[in-house]
Amino acid sequence: MAQIICRDLTIGYEGKTVVQNINLSVKKGDYLCVIGENGAGKSTFMKTLLGLLPPVSGKIEFYDGLKKNEIGYLPQQTEVQKDFPASVREIVLSGCQNHLGFWPFYRTKEKKYAEDMMKKLQITHLSKRCYRELSGGQQQRVLLARALCATRKILLLDEPVSGLDSQMTEEMYRLIEKINREDKITIIMISHDIRGAMEYASHILQIGQKVIFESKENYLRAYTKRSVLGNTGGKK
């Protein structure tokens, strides 16, 4: 079942068109890796999906009962975020805000769900620690737990391994893959680490002057063919 469909979508910001003619269908349980050069429009695409930026033209359609405020989002970290003076538990619990409606306090079910997500991400022992005292890998686990509190259906991850060393990067990829496989949560992830990110992906969206949306197998087959033709002097 499709969760998100983009039809002839053109995206941009401040009156500037960045990417044109994005057509894709993301189904429940897909793992979509979004790739492209710096400044190609990857983060603009993600912000448009979230409703933080309006489409220039075209449509984004949500299915499977999905609402914009039910999408878990892990943005790129900034230095301000890294120095945020709150406890791990407070940050994870804040991911439940969209479920409160007009209720002014966190209820037992939100608190339990936050505890469950901390357990899943293996950060329960850090719950009383100040976020800014944590390592980069621990901080990313906290933010991922927070994003999971916002959704049971789909996660949007913008450079989730940025600034992590190779060991922490691999741990984060395995964790995201486990969430996708075991919990059937759809993943849409931006990453500059193309090789590492694509290892677990089911689909690839390449954003740039040319937009390509394919299954990983078809994308890699076409990429290999282009490389062979280029190396043998064939037509590109």
Predicted regions span which residues?
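H-loop/switch region of ABC-family ATPase nucleotide-binding domains
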Residues: 191-192
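H-loop (His-switch) and adjacent beta-strand-loop-beta switch element
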Residues: 202-216
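Conserved ABC ATPase signature
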Residues: 130-134, 138
